[in-house]
Structure formats: C-alpha cells, structure tokens
Amino acid sequence: FGGGQTERQVQLIQDFKPDIIMVTPSYMLAIADEFERQGIDPRSSSLRLGIFGAEPWTNDMRAAIEHRMGIDAVDIYGLSEVMGPGVASECIETKDGPTIWEDHFYPEIIDPDTGEVLPDGEPGELVFTSLTKEAFPIIRYRTRDLTRLLPGTARSMRRMEKVTGRSDDMIILR
C-alpha cells in the first residue's frame, strides 16, 4: 500500500481480507482514521498483523495501532543499499527489537568517530556486511544509524535496539 488513496486502501482491505499489512506506522494510523471516518470499526477488519518500518515510531504509536486496529504490530528494519526492508524484523512473541538475520548479514557496532569495533551492548553506529548477496556484496557498510546489539531472545540471532539517532545528524542554523 502506498501513502495515497487511503479510502481505496480501506476498500481493498474490506474486499480482499488480508491477514497482514506492511506500511509505515503513521500510514496505519491514517488507515485507522479512514475506517472510523467511514463508520467502520477498524478492529472488525481481517487484519491480524502489521509490519511497520521506514520511519521512526514510538511505543505509544505501537499501542495506538494495536488498540485501534486489533492487530499485533512489529518493527522491521532495512536499508535499500543493503537489500531493502529485510535486514532485521521483530519477533511477534517478544516485540523487543528487530532480530538481525545473521544468516545473511554480519552486524557490528563501531565508534562513529574512530571506527573501532565495540562489544555487544555498547551504543554506536551499526555496520553491516552481507554474507549471501552475490552480484553486489556489501562490506562493512556504515549505516549511520545509532543503536546497540543485544542478545537474541526468541531466536539465537542477535537483535538490535530501536535506532536512537544518526551519526550524521546535524542542525543548520541561519
């Protein structure tokens, strides 16, 4: 689903009855608004799971989506430079941060100023090396995203904390 024609998106959900939706979290709230504008209880839709990414979102947004839509809401992390949205996704059982798909990517956290590799649990810049990409492999790609690597919970692969900022954030004063 795209960011436009929200009325049509609600109609498509009603007609095709999907179980899962993958949009930005802010657009899911717009879809909930449109359901309500049409006099339809969003919780009555066929949706059971929402996969949300492409923008930062808070735990309050997650709670609002889950309450208003009656679905589970999970986070997905990705970069178009690395392989699109499929780099890490949250486990529906724990919802405690995206689990990195370490069978495809080798994650590291580095000091953004020195490039020094930091141990798991330390905050720093997320770096990825692709392990299975053949035509255009990525080696130690600096994402500029600030986070921490944490032990896995639902699976054996490590998970990442929500991105807390960017190493190249700046404010321009005029």
Each model region followed by its residue ranges:
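Active-site glycine/GP-rich loop and adjacent strand/helix microenvironment
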Residues: F1-R174
